Amino acid sequence: MNQEITNDEARERYEDIAHELAATHSDVELRKLFSMPAIYVKGKACAGFTQGKEMVFKLTGAAHAEALGLEGAHLFDPGGMDRPMKEWVVVPAAHAAEWPRLAELALAYVAGR
């Protein structure tokens, strides 16, 4: 379901997801990636929150294709130099309802679960 939310609401949703993952997975840490808040598992980044109202997820296979198929989603290009990180998908806040599930999928992928 698409819905418009504010920057503060988007950040709060990211924080809820990040803290829930950290509370339920002992190998999850909350750190920075490219100056943005990020979720790490086993020392590797799996998701983050951009300066805008977007979350980024490291995904593969069907999960990657599904996320990339969401309206407004695109590959993550942190430097804006047309060199996207191919496994990373930016998902706008209009799809914030999908963020928790995508975060779990990203965590599982990066952790090798």
What spans do the regions from the language model cover?
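Charge-dense, helix-prone N-terminal extensions
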Residues: 1-113
